[in-house]
């Protein structure tokens, strides 16, 4: 009975694999329960100050979850990722349901690079192009609409200028 032996081997494999599958599912579910701290930042551009309410992603779990599974963002809302020191970073849009602009910010709060309209659900990597301290994600197309550009300043406590 080759089939019976196969069934036993398959049953053992499933028995040993089940805890890992459950753990992976629990980790994904845990991400849905993350309570991000809220903060306010200001972007200085073209003689204006634009105020944003942001969720803070300050640890590996928060940064890896980011805006995944969100269905919407308000017009002046976003997420600020803090990497604590300047470094090259890359993002992707896996499990992210809305287009985003990614604003890459130096340690002094200067916008270094803007990636516009990142494609929802894409697994293509989006590099910072420069070492950065933080990344601000806002609604796709907002950076252009608001006239944001490299060289503009972001004021927030993590940049020491708020």
Name each model feature, range by range.
Residues 30-162:
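Compact, glycine-rich, soluble single-domain proteins
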Residues 1-10, 14, 18-24:
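N-terminal secretory signal peptides
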């Amino acid at each position: 009975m080759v089939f019976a032996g196969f069934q036993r081997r398959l049953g053992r494999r499933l028995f040993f694999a089940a805890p890992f599958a459950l753990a992976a599912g629990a980790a994904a579910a845990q991400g849905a329960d993350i309570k991000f701290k809220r903060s306010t930042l200001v972007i200085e551009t073209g003689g204006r100050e634009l105020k944003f309410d942001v969720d803070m992603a300050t640890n590996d779990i928060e940064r890896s979850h980011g805006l995944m599974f969100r269905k919407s963002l308000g017009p002046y809302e976003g997420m600020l990722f803090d990497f604590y020191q300047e470094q090259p970073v890359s993002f992707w849009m896996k499990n992210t349901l809305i287009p985003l602009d990614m604003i890459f910010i130096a340690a002094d709060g200067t916008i270094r690079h803007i990636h516009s309209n990142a494609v929802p659900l894409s697994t293509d990597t989006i590099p910072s192009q420069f070492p950065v301290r933080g990344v601000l994600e806002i609604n796709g197309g907002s950076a252009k609409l608001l006239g944001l550009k490299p060289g503009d300043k972001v004021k927030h406590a993590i940049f020491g200028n708020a």
